[in-house]
């Protein structure tokens, strides 16, 4: 999406800017005290930095908060079509941090962003991670083979994203899909997602991420992440069941697990975006 096409009420539009690093033209929210400790926030598949709109105010009072749209999502664009997988995306995010001359005090990731946060903790000096309904599980059974194959096939077809945008992106349909996650977000939140999914480039980025996603090496490496990790799991999450975080916590040497009421988009429903809970853990 061209930033000039963003709705006037797009969250933190005025605090975001382009950052070109290698093949990626990032769109990055950068807010809070410039000399404060840095928090890097990573959204999930199909979302954008807007999804942290309720969390950012609570965090940015004390921290410099950096929120990029992931490659191919929102307003971030990449010409490297083979770098949408977990490890390449983590590598490119670290290059963005180096470009900004920051080392995050913690990385906070939602869903697939939680997996990327853990990959960063494994590969870089990132000292702490918060995962919100972190997507740390494979598709089960036959779906584990069929779904990635479908995504690879669809991502290779030039007409797939426009078709999804044209026939599957009505406000009503998107609202229904969001409700199926176990979270009912407000009308403004649904409108933001509608704007994204009505953009073929955003849909294409999501398909490429699905096609190139491989969790196996990270799952096997969880015992090597000897850093504090705070996993927040929504008991009503229908996209990534709470047991996924519970299972991962057993393999992380310094994990804290907290199960709370709510669905997959719990940080978009909670009045403070879960910032209070996260600050308590970061500063406790």
From Swiss-Prot:
Reaction catalysis annotation: protoporphyrin IX + Mg(2+) + ATP + H2O = Mg-protoporphyrin IX + ADP + phosphate + 3 H(+)
Molecular function GO terms recorded: ATP binding; magnesium chelatase activity; monoacylglycerol lipase activity
Organism from which the protein derives: Rhodobacter capsulatus
Pathway per the UniProt entry: Porphyrin-containing compound metabolism; bacteriochlorophyll biosynthesis (light-independent)
Protein name, as recorded: Magnesium-chelatase 30 kDa subunit
NCBIfam families xref list: bchO_mg_che_rel
Keywords: ATP-binding, Bacteriochlorophyll biosynthesis, Chlorophyll biosynthesis, Ligase, Nucleotide-binding, Photosynthesis
Gene Ontology BP terms: acylglycerol catabolic process; light-independent bacteriochlorophyll biosynthetic process; photosynthesis
Family: Belongs to the lipase/esterase LIP3/BchO family.
GO CC aspect terms: membrane
E.C. code: 6.6.1.1
Entries under InterPro entries matching the protein: AB_hydrolase_1, AB_hydrolase_fold, AB_hydrolase_sf, BchO
SUPFAM superfamilies, per database record: alpha/beta-Hydrolases
Domain AB hydrolase-1: 37-269
Stored PANTHER family: HYDROLASE, PUTATIVE (AFU_ORTHOLOGUE AFUA_2G14860)-RELATED, MONOACYLGLYCEROL LIPASE
